[in-house]
Amino acid sequence: MPHETLLDNQGWFKKLARRFGPGHVVNTCFLIVMLFSTLLTWREVMILKDAYVASQRNHLGSVANVLDRQLQFNMDRLIFLRNGMHEALVAPLAFSALQSAVTQFEQRRVRHFWQLELDKRRTLPLYGVSDQFVARTTLLSRESRDLANELTATLELGYLARLARSSAMLTLETMYVSCSGFYLSTLPTAYGSDIVSRYYQYVTQPWFIEQSQRRNPQRGVRWFTSAQPYVADEQKKVTASLPLDHDNYWYGVLAMDIPVASLQRFLRDAAEKDIEGEYQLYDNHLRLLTDSAPEQQTANTLNDRERALLAREIEKDTLGGLRLGTHYVSWERLDHFDGVLLRVHTLREGIQGNFGSISIALTLLWVLFTAMLLISWGVIRHMVKNMFVLQNSLQWQAWHDPLTRLYNRGALFEKASRLAKRYREARQPFSVIQLDLDYFKSVNDRFGHQAGDRVLSHAAGLIGSTIRAHDIAGRVGGEEFCIVLPGATKAQALQIAERIRQRINDKEILVTKSTTLRISASMGISSAEEYGDYDFEQLQSLADKRLYYAKQSGRNRICASDATQEREKK
């Protein structure tokens, strides 16, 4: 193995190039390309995600707006009826029919149940219970001084409620329930004990009790979910209720029942063109009221954990979206209903939709690009590795002697010149040994050139194993070698040369199958400390001259001076 001293003053670029070879450069470039392609794909995914969320909100918003407008129409009607009653309380009409109704009330108020009706074709009947029934609870009272005005106002409400009925409305029933023991409803009641049970059912409902001044100080519309068993089909309903007040006195409650079936039918009609997703309507306690799923299909209901997560998000904003497992749920609060409308979009629907197709295509493109990139990386990495190996091999062949595996003459002179310059600047010793194998020509003549090659290779191995780690050695001629000893004085160089001479002389070489041969070497030594000259060619020339003196003096010896002061060892 050749020995080489690493120079401390090598540039940072060469050190970096030595640490990061072509393979590292290729790896880094491909890693950067893959990183940027992944970031670009991720950016596209984020844009696609935002577009998907916006699409979900747009679909939900369109249905929510239609439902909200329909509910607003019903709420406006309820407020209109409340305002009409309020005006009738403040300025009652002086019609004889109304006065006659008041008189009839005074006559019938003690009855267990009673009914007042002005005109069956134009107004709705008024139903009531006895004074004794009203006196049973503190919630009800007939002590109002405006009882007569409330009675006539309720009869006027019957006229308005009949006129305001429309097939486009969602409501099943509109009613006014008074704290004074009577009620009016768009659904007729058979005359009899059903009047008492129905009034009792009304005044015990949450939508009536919760409208007291203490429980509803804002006096606005409130929504309630209830099942009313007296209805023939016993269907589930939501009820909007609005209190009637005047001069800080609570007269009663105007209410409107909306069947859940009507809301379901409306949702299905509104979402019939939207083949993806399912709409669900929840009340203010996140209880499912209805959904747009077909009758033969099971709704995608939320479990308790998902409902809790959704409730936490709804508290933060009036609309938004949330990923719950394989479902994406977008939600929006309704302006005219105390609840929230949800759109549930499953993963399967998402994959089958437009955004799913785009996502799959984008994923396949990224996978294809990444696969091509990895294949290209492997091919180029293999090519670069082979080229790097070939380059190193060619460089090694250009700098080394293939037989002895030491530096050739050109490489040795180049490296030695750089070392000499460095040690001259550092004012450190620098020595050179010139070595020649004795009688080498006779080995070629007697045993052939193959034997000569074995001798050269054997001698080079002994030289390389004897010199120090930072010394360098090279073959400069046929059987001639040069050894550069940076940092070695002339005395140290002489010791090293002596070790080399002894090892070469002591080892026998097998030149043929049955013949061994012992060789010797003559050496000349020069050192920069003699004349202060660090020019390598001059030092090598001086060592070569002293090598000639050693051969003239009998071979197998070392010459370290110009004439007679050579040291001889046998």
UniProtKB/Swiss-Prot annotation:
Q: Does the keyword Membrane apply?
A: yes
Where is it found, in Gene Ontology cellular component terms?
Answer: plasma membrane
Single GO molecular function:
metal ion binding
Positions bound to Mg(2+): 436, 479
Q: Which reaction does it catalyse?
A: 2 GTP = 3',3'-c-di-GMP + 2 diphosphate
Q: Which UniProt keywords apply?
A: Cell inner membrane, Cell membrane, Cellulose biosynthesis, GTP-binding, Magnesium, Membrane, Metal-binding, Nucleotide-binding, Transferase, Transmembrane, Transmembrane helix
Q: Which residues form the active site?
A: 479
Q: Where is this site: Transition state stabilizer?
A: 441
Subunit-structure text: Homodimer.
PANTHER family, per the entry:
DIGUANYLATE CYCLASE DGCQ-RELATED, REGULATORY COMPONENTS OF SENSORY TRANSDUCTION SYSTEM
What is the protein name given in its UniProt record? Probable diguanylate cyclase DgcQ
Q: Which gene encodes it?
A: dgcQ
